[in-house]
């Protein structure tokens, strides 16, 4: 875009799905409420055969966001980063709460999210373009 400064960053994270299954079995709703928004829980738990895969993918996406932004988790909670689905079904990122403070300097953020699952692993790659 002519006349605009932008930054393009990418983050990726890999999650062992049985780890998420174990946390879900051990901590149940407490785990879900600590990590996932109500919308994420609704989507992930709607498909019992795929719920651990979906939860693991969203965990990976949240981690990938912090890597793409280069901020780590400094003062940001898991629920401050939310994976939402557009009307098209495409996943994207919505920042809430303290995560918004990390990106104040950008006028606009464009997100791309990609998930993949293979047996016991879920991976998410997040691309963000920030316009100043």
UniProtKB/Swiss-Prot annotation:
Keywords in alphabetical order: Cytoplasm, Fatty acid biosynthesis, Fatty acid metabolism, Lipid biosynthesis, Lipid metabolism, Magnesium, Metal-binding, Transferase
Q: Gene3D superfamilies this protein is in? A: 4'-phosphopantetheinyl transferase domain
**Keyword Methyltransferase assigned:** no
CC terms in the record's Gene Ontology section: cytoplasm
EC nos: 2.7.8.7
Query: Does the record carry Transmembrane as a key word?
Result: no
Coiled-coil residues are none
Tree of life domain: Bacteria
**Subcellular location, principal:** cytoplasm
Q: Name one GO biological process term.
A: fatty acid biosynthetic process
Function text: Transfers the 4'-phosphopantetheine moiety from coenzyme A to a Ser of acyl-carrier-protein.
Q: What is this protein called?
A: Holo-[acyl-carrier-protein] synthase
- Say which species the protein is native to: Gloeobacter violaceus (strain ATCC 29082 / PCC 7421)
Could you read off the lineage of the organism from its UniProt record? Bacteria, Bacillati, Cyanobacteriota, Cyanophyceae, Gloeobacterales
Question: What's the name of its gene?
Answer: acpS
